[in-house]
């Protein structure tokens, strides 16, 4: 009797959060907390990069730093690369070195983000649907299967990514071409090899303990499905503020340099993880959650459900994973085109784009936070079979994303663009106008990335997983690959490297418009037909049965 009453109270508590006379207000109730969650998470990464750039090299901010231009030169002279001093006038310095380390590490960081949401996101979608239709068995299956499979998957992928991480970093700087032209610039060769070595240490720390942020992500999705918006809006942002303090202490007052950032990141992830655990223990004691530890059983994994979870999460994995590939190819081609079309050092434009790309990533992450809030509401409504409300959600989401994106772009690119670049990324006065021009171009992605991804979450939530994969890969591969070679050819033909800078935004715009059209057409013309007469496709029937 008590268990029935407890289940009723849990369901009533959750229903009160999801139900509202105004659907738009319900969406805002979920999107605003996830927006701030994503904003603070991205802001941590953003500020982390700024503090590394500001505090690691010796300057007025850190006069005791051991990382100086001279220390870089001295290390070069003591290396096997040193032949003469003739290459020391290449313009490379310690600040460019640090920016290069951060830049070539970013694709692997994006890949880790893709891995982190693969199982957790699909689990969250299934969990929300099960709560929407009050399916107690499916709720417990999703919780049990999601927790165990996330843990196992996290441990396996850590070792897998570690096995190829250094080779990936090599490719980012096109190391093979440097080796073929060793005599051309021995200091450049030394510079890039050292950057790869330091970046390897940096990513090894993050990869080796990636299970911690992965489990935190699972708890985030499941807590959101239960309507824990207040916790999500307050505790993770506080944890990120603590992260920032730890980064400052390690990069400013230790000799770890860039590595201090990775150590601080892991400590911050651990704090966030412990906050979720403590909160869940509290909810368990008061019997206010479906996420009960006593119901976890290692021998009761529903493998059919795990397949469905993986199929749903695959779209987000494809999106983030393909974006990692996009960044890798973009950086590698940019370095090669800089050599081919300019007299600048190989990483001049790569380091100049550090600020614009970091700001763009911050803005896009915040907008993706909105989508996560929408995904939870949409999954819940799908569980209730309220298809008309899902249509409205799809339209509201595009409007919300464009509105927030416009506000962020006006603030970070137009109003305060130069101030951010000069104050936080140490862009010199002579390069400031060019960097700001690049920033205006690169940040324009924000209008298209999330609005296009809205179609992905719509297809994920309504069991059309193949369509969600297509949407994800359209942005990451289908559009990018042909554009990559088109922009490379135009850049070489015109001998103008600035043409290539437009590639990321052109890719986001074209893919975003295609995906928006695809999602809206399906929602308004085919959705009712699909649910009135579900197709007999074996994959769709399998997902419908086990989700």
Swiss-Prot record:
Q: Where in the cell is it found?
A: Cell membrane
Q: List the disulfide bonds.
A: none
Keyword annotations from UniProtKB, A to Z: Cell membrane, Membrane, Transmembrane, Transmembrane helix
Query: Which source organism?
Result: Mycoplasma genitalium (strain ATCC 33530 / DSM 19775 / NCTC 10195 / G37) (Mycoplasmoides genitalium)
**Regions that span the bilayer:** 33-53, 107-127, 145-165, 203-223, 231-251, 263-283, 298-318, 351-371, 397-417, 432-452, 470-490, 499-519
Q: Name one GO cellular component term.
A: plasma membrane
Judging by the UniProt lineage, the source's domain of life is: Bacteria
Entry-linked PANTHER family: MULTIDRUG EXPORT PROTEIN MEPA (PTHR43823:SF3), SPORULATION PROTEIN YKVU (PTHR43823)
> What's this protein's name?
Uncharacterized protein MG447
Read off the Pfam families from this record: MatE (PF01554)
Note the InterPro entries from the entry: MATE_fam, MATE_MepA_subfamily
In alphabetical order, the GO MF annotations are: antiporter activity; xenobiotic transmembrane transporter activity
Q: How does it sit in the membrane?
A: Multi-pass membrane protein
